[in-house]
UniProtKB/Swiss-Prot annotation:
Cellular component GO terms, alphabetical: cytoplasm
Catalytic activity: dTTP + H2O = dTMP + diphosphate + H(+); UTP + H2O = UMP + diphosphate + H(+)
Protein name per the record: dTTP/UTP pyrophosphatase
The enzyme's E.C. designation: 3.6.1.9
Length: 200
């Protein structure tokens, strides 16, 4: 049994969600010379489902190498990746305010999918889970989109919004996992952690 895990994620939401589960963790973040962004390039013809699972697994492999390179004690490693897709189009993190505005305009008045993949690596192997949720946004005015983008909240978030923040006012309905939409589906994550023999 393990008493803690390594979290290979910079996301404050994922930290909050792990704490909510009562999981002890240490951060295992990328070194300066690692090109984390290169992992997130969409491959030609790749579906959103395949994309998010591939990126999550690559993050786990990179974190495992990082743990070994730093000669850290053995403990499970958790990685996660979230993507938003509308139709078959992957909406990643916006590059700037104009990019965020375009994404939010596309999401306005429609239903999109939020896919969050989770990978846990332990001595028992590499185990994966995928959470798929549907989110319906009410129609948003151009002024509302502009105000939200000006808040700075959309930057750094897949699909240009965080459901736990100001964007909650645009969410008409969700089907699936609220924590998954935030970035770490707790039901699936807890099952993976039990598989990895983590005490929490």
């Amino acid at each position: 049994m393990h008493d803690y895990l390594y979290l290979a994620s910079q996301s404050p939401r994922r930290r909050e969600l792990l704490t909510q589960l009562g999981v002890r963790y240490e951060l295992l973040l990328a070194d300066d010379e690692e090109d984390a962004e290169a992992l997130e390039v969409v491959q030609p013809g790749e579906t959103p489902d395949d994309y998010v699972q591939r990126v999550c697994a690559l993050k786990a492999e990179a974190a495992l190498r990082r743990r070994e390179r730093r000669a850290l004690p053995d403990a499970p490693i958790l990685t996660s990746d979230t993507t938003v897709c509308l139709g078959g189009e992957i909406l990643g993190k916006p590059g700037d305010g104009a990019d965020a505005s375009a994404m939010l305009k596309a999401l306005s008045g429609s239903t999109h999918r939020v896919l969050t993949a989770v990978t846990v690596v332990s001595t028992l192997g590499m185990h994966h889970a995928l959470s798929i949720s549907r989110v319906t946004f009410r129609a948003m005015t151009a002024a509302e989109i502009e105000r939200y983008v000006d808040s700075g909240e959309p930057l750094g978030k897949a699909g240009a919004y965080g459901i736990q923040g100001r964007a909650a006012e645009f969410v008409e309905r969700i089907e699936g996992s609220y924590s998954g939409i935030m970035g770490l589906p707790l039901f699936e994550t807890a099952a993976l952690l039990r598989q990895a023999r983590l005490r929490f």
